[in-house]
Amino acid sequence: MDETTHGLSDKVLDRAAVIEFWDIDVEAFPGWKTSALAEAQIARVRDTLKGLVNALRPARLHFGWRTIHDVIGYIEQAERGGVIDFDSALDQAIYAKVLPKLRGEDTPRVQAAFADTSSLLRDMRLADSAAKVAELQDDLRSLGSARFWR
């Protein structure tokens, strides 16, 4: 069940076992071992994704292994194509696969998650992604809520 699902009735919950598995370990992702990226590139992607999971965790806006797999796959394809450099591919992958999940009301948790995400993206020199999060922060302040899709 996720935020798009209606809540379950007490009758159903009486018969169910609820297991939460939303908190993932980025380091444990099995795809790191099979990636075609260079070791330094893998380290940069892993550090970026670990930082994003940690920044987004308090607001439960983080992501799972499928997103990690897709980010790696996007960068690998970009490397094969030779059209864009690694840093641009990482920025585009984060923008396309992680940032669309960002949304929320103007609460301390969401403010902190957006601030930490913004700081990380600037530190990692992911300019397009950092600019998008800055827009979301502006929306949060001025509108009381923010979402990737405007």
Predicted regions and their residues:
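C-terminal regulatory/interaction module of P-loop NTP-utilizing enzymes
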Residues: M1-R150
